[in-house]
Every structure is written in structure tokens, then in C-alpha cells.
Amino acid sequence: MRPRALPALAAFTLLAACGAQADPNWRVIDPENLMVIETSKGRIIVELRPDLAPQAVARMKQLTRAGLYNGLQFHRVIDGFVAQTGNPGNKDGGKSDLSNLPAEFTAKLPRTDYHAAVTRSDGSAGFLGTLPVETTSEAEDRRRNEGTTQFWGAYCPGVVGMGRDDAFDSANSEFFFMRGAARRLDRLYTVVGMTVDGIEH
């Protein structure tokens, strides 16, 4: 596996943006928040979400640019659940030399880029860009009167999260791709992004 941040994919993004101008529903992804992972099965492209998990996304970019992920295997693959990588020792439970990260299970954000698909009395479900998310209710937002909504990633197929030990504040370098829905992980693991291409790999 060889992940890389995408200065090289800027040309791809520019070409995509040219086609996007004809379609008002097209959304161009910031190349700074794209991660390309080359595997023996094909290319995987992930849109990282620093608005939801700024420290975890910064760590993934740092480790990618440092080459830590180059040549690593997916050391934990469970059909219908996850495919996990990012351990420098190619086994479960390893870490980089950097300190562990704090949990970033939820984020307070404005509703500007949010598209609700389902609204309930206790919250809503929808998308932040390509990422499936859940939120607190608008009534709760008004009660808090902060001008923001509490968001958290919904662990659906293609969502990318940070691996960790039993302690909530133990994410470090490992990350995983959801291969099926596991909503029991919501608000227990930091969501860092969404697979936008190559989910079949």
C-alpha cells in the first residue's frame, strides 16, 4: 500500500473541475484533503474531513508525507466489517513514534454544508459532502444557542475511521475502511473521511 497526499492529483482535480462547471450538482473536493492509496487490488481515493477530526486528519497527512504508510499491509481484514492498516509493524496494535491523539468522536459545526436526508425529533441523518453523518436536532441547537450543530460520522460502508486501543484517547497511526455498516461504532471511534473511489478494493 502506498498512500500519498495529492499534489500529484491536482491535475486530476482540475480536469474534474472543468467537467464540473457544466453540472451544478458537482462538488470539487479540495486536493489538500484527498488521500490516494495504491494497493495491489487498485487505487482507493479518500476525502479527508478536517472539519470533523482536525487532529486525526493532520496526523494522517503528516504520516503520509513522512512515508510511514508506504509498503504497509492491510493487517486486519474482516469481510463485511473492516479493512485496517497503518501499523508500522504490519500487525494489530502498533503505533507510530508520535503521541496518541485525543478522541474526536463529534464536532460542532454550522449546518451550511449539511444535507439532511432524514429528520427526526431527536436529530437528523444526512451528508457532509460525501460523508454520512448524524446530528442533534434543530430544537437542541436552538436550546444551546451556539450557532452550531453537533455532528458525528455514521459508520457505513466506505467510511474511514482511526483505529485505537481500548482507551478512547489512543488513536495514533492506524486507520480502517468500513466494509459494511457498523453503527455501534458511532461516537466511539474518530471518523476521518469517506472513500470516494475504489470502495470495491
Across the structure, where does each feature detected by a protein language model lie?
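Bacterial N-terminal signal peptides
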Residues: 7-16
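Intrinsically disordered, low-complexity Ser/Thr/Pro-rich tracts
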Residues: 6-7, 38
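N-terminal secretory signal peptides that target proteins for export/translocation
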Residues: 1-2
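Cyclophilin-like peptidyl-prolyl cis-trans isomerases
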Residues: 18-201
